[in-house]
Amino acid sequence: MNALSPVTAPKARSFRLEPRQPAASHEEERLHRKQRLAATFRLFGRYGFDQGLAGHVTARDPEFPEQYWINPLGVHFSQIRTSDLQLVDHDGNILIGNRPINNAGFTIHSALHKARPDEIAAAHTQFT
């Protein structure tokens, strides 16, 4: 039985996403993306999409599109906060933050962000 079987999966609830007004500045949009990214990690952690160190989710920086925010290595998804996120460039340099990142995650996401400059975020995770 997997984590999403009808026996163990949480009951689905529907919700409606309201349109969002464009951000007034790069800083406002950056905060919005980082908050949503941290919330995504916590949701993934809550529902079991957090096996080991294999998962990573990234969001492109709005001001510097060749850079993106990624989770630090060794922090459980359910514990990630906005302040934990690391800003990296396509070469793997950590520009903001002082924690290591998952090298496999960097390799996957840097290729995705280079190949798809129109995409804002990407996720890769594993579960049992």
Please name every model-derived segment.
Residues M1-A24, R33:
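Extreme N-terminal flexible tails
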